[in-house]
């Protein structure tokens, strides 16, 4: 038993060290294959000897079952926010004031102000026992299970007293874009994604979203003879907490201010979003003397970067309808350059936003890039308001079908609920044929609009009857000739085999994006089973809360929708999970094998995966591992993957497998 216990301890220490170098230092020490083998060895030992599982084992980070809510706990010391400074003059005054009050020429530490979610960790006897959100500053929610899924955060530290460690949890730019691309309703910015993820009741979802963290504060540091902020940061590093590598220390006020101004210009190069820099007095000995207001400490201040604001004239408001019937208010603007991009429109969200901000046509408005991506109207420059401004009226009726718009309880958005609405149906058909859904190439929004207006395609069902309307289509000014029409029909026919997940995505059910659609397809296996699911059954599923469950339940209990499904099935559109009822090539050497694809091909990766899945019921890997059966190599494959495959004697094949 001692040999097994020692082996487990060695593996835990080894993997923790590899995790630290990979997730904190960004310096991987071994390749993925070696890491996976070590991890699997540890998993097997723990499976065989569950009584020897250690609390800080890397295997204990994976997400668990969903919880009903988070326990609220008091902070040992208040989690205050920082006072903001918007000019270097304010920073200079802050420094001068502290030097005067302390009668010293002090050092100041400059740290990044990460645009994320504040977190306070508590360790007792060296073990992480609580992870509290800021909450109202006095009371926070304990999101411990979610925080444990963040691999850069130590589950244990070599310190036996009770201690708090504070920092920020965030999502980097690349991860934010990748996750948002999978969501039907994307997050407005990375901070919202981090906040929503860390408070998700299902820690499995949190684990999938690759949250990151940086730490910077030990509230009771003086009790442990830590006397400066630089000592705090050094201690955190020794305990293997992730700490920012962009921290600077200054005694000269002018050098510090020059650094702030220079940093603003290079912040775009960072992999994560900042909304400023924090300037802290380095000496903790003066913290108690300086004290704090009810909201902010007096020994630190946040220098906020100048947002990318420009002013222009709002010339009109465009009101459109989305595929779910949601009403979108968009400001039409006089062309203006914003952060290197020509902007002629910006979102106004909804009418409540317009009313609250008192935004009018012909106003001069301030626009900015929210989350550095989407232009938004921030406010009106009232000093430039003239007598020709026109008050924007709330849209009462759908601009497309003239149906009365409705507001759903607890939502600020308006909706057109008429399922025969022209614009709503055009948007739905356009989404149905998109790559995210049924991936029917050859149809764009303009073509769909003309087909709709000529009564050739009025719903997604009509797409599958288009093959019988060749003469009518060719007569339209669509630049579609005989050859293109035949190719379009082939694409439509091929989409029938896409399976339940893509079909469910394309139906445009509110709150159901492609990721949730795949999960539902894997669970229910076919549309009929989903159709007959109870509300309680839906609520119990991962990724499905009450709001989403009600949306699904209501959609599948609408007679019109049931008829839609029936009509699709009559046209041989597959409503089962993809592998079911497919004539797989079961005698092939490729049947139910695992492939890795590398290099470029004449069709997309998604198309390759769809083709091979339909033929061989296969799976796919992103890295070369012993579990990979075949590597498919195209033009300019990744040499590292090819060499690794050769080392493992994995057969390397080409695109002949699907041609």
UniProtKB/Swiss-Prot annotation:
**Per its Swiss-Prot or TrEMBL entry, what cofactor is needed?**
Mg(2+); Mn(2+)
> Does the entry feature the keyword Zinc, yes or no?
yes
Q: What Pfam families does the database record attribute to this sequence?
A: BRCT, DNA_ligase_aden, DNA_ligase_OB, DNA_ligase_ZBD, HHH_2
Ordered alphabetically, the record's keywords are: DNA damage, DNA repair, DNA replication, Ligase, Magnesium, Manganese, Metal-binding, NAD, Zinc
Q: Where, by residue number, does Zn(2+) bind?
A: 398, 401, 416, 421
Q: Where is the BRCT domain?
A: 585-655
Q: Tell me if Iron is a UniProt keyword of this record.
A: no
Record GO cellular component, one term: cytosol
EC code(s) of this entry: 6.5.1.2
Catalytic machinery residues: 113
Catalysis performed (reactions): NAD(+) + (deoxyribonucleotide)n-3'-hydroxyl + 5'-phospho-(deoxyribonucleotide)m = (deoxyribonucleotide)n+m + AMP + beta-nicotinamide D-nucleotide
Q: What class of enzyme is it?
A: ligase
Q: List, in alphabetical order, the GO biological process terms annotated in this UniProt record.
A: DNA repair; DNA replication
List of residues binding NAD(+): 32-36, 81-82, 111, 134, 168, 280, 304
Q: Name one GO molecular function term.
A: DNA ligase (NAD+) activity
Database matches in HAMAP family: DNA_ligase_A
Record PANTHER family? CHROMOSOME TRANSMISSION FIDELITY FACTOR 18, DNA LIGASE
Q: Which family does it belong to?
A: Belongs to the NAD-dependent DNA ligase family. LigA subfamily.
Biological function: DNA ligase that catalyzes the formation of phosphodiester linkages between 5'-phosphoryl and 3'-hydroxyl groups in double-stranded DNA using NAD as a coenzyme and as the energy source for the reaction. It is essential for DNA replication and repair of damaged DNA.
What this protein is called in its record is: DNA ligase
Species of provenance: Mycoplasma genitalium (strain ATCC 33530 / DSM 19775 / NCTC 10195 / G37) (Mycoplasmoides genitalium)
* The encoding gene: ligA
